[in-house]
Amino acid sequence: AKITEMAIKKLCIKFLFVSLSFLIIIMNEYILAIESSCDDTSAAVLRGTTVLSNIIANQEVHRQYGGVIPELASRAHQQNIIPVVDAALKHANIAKNQLSAIAFTRGPGLLGSLLVGTSFSKAFALSLDIPLIEVNHTNGHIMALFAQEEGEINEIPQFPFLCLAVSGGHTQIIKVNDYFDLDIIGKTIDDAAGEAFDKIAKIMGLPYPGGPIIDRLAKEGNPNAFSFSKANLPGLNYSFSGLKTSFLYFLRDRLKEDPDFIEKNKADLCASIQKEIIDTLMKKLVKATKETGIKQVAIAGGVSANSGLQNAMHENG
């Protein structure tokens, strides 16, 4: 009886949350959205699904370490969050008392970073006496596909569709049945694709974040210059740790023969490793379309900005 009662309570809470979210969107109310899951402090104001402002404060402090330092990230969030939110409201040309709700990232992400965004959102919502909407970070990547820039009309995916959510922390193939009905049908069992890009860039001595730099250099290189061993998992799951290790050992052996090997072959190395990562992503995604029968596919997350991945998506229709 207790289990049944608890299940009913959870169902009622979910129903109320879904109803609140849809009501706010349909009524074109103003929503403040706050994101602090990693090293960027972000705030946006939306009217329904229209983005009125989107302010991002980057944390340059991590560049010297070649990766995100959690303690430094949380401190920077504390410094940035008030100015960022203030700027978001000003750019949207609204006052705080016009907000109908505050949405914030509840996870996954760095604990200290999440706490800053969560604490600020709760305190701000309490002071304004408006509802809070918790957002899963990965789901947020997907829901961003439905957002529209003011004055623009973008193509919106129709349900059901497959989404390749690929970032520094996640690599997942998600079957999106509805706004609140998402099934993960494939995921990485170790490193995320974005993490692999950044770690490989670090091995090459490139600055952080390395993914965009690899993408830029890859445009000047030969993607077939070098090949690397990669995992061939059954099903729809990914693995990138083996590819990273193969790249590391490949460079180690080449550098013994020529200490300037990386500098001489930088563009080809970037093009080749990017091709391997993208081929791995696309192979599983194409397999997912065949297994599910769903042809409509979208990409979301930070790595979706990669030009090579975008080209591969277009080539596969």
Question: What is each PLM-predicted segment?
Answer:
Residues 29-108, 137, 141:
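N-terminal beta-alpha supersecondary unit
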Residues 41-46, 163, 171-175:
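Short beta-strand scaffold segments in enzyme catalytic cores
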Residues 104-107, 124, 167, 298-306:
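Glycine-rich beta-strand-to-loop/alpha-helix junction loops that act as flexible
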Residues 109-128:
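DPxDG-like acidic metal-binding loop motif
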Residues 135-161:
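Conserved phosphate-binding catalytic cores of ATP/NTP-utilizing and phosphoryl-transfer enzymes
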Residues 177-220, 251-252:
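Glycine-rich phosphate-binding loop plus the immediately following alpha-helix
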Residues 216-297, 307-315:
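A contiguous, well-structured pocket-lining segment that forms one wall/lid of small-molecule binding clefts
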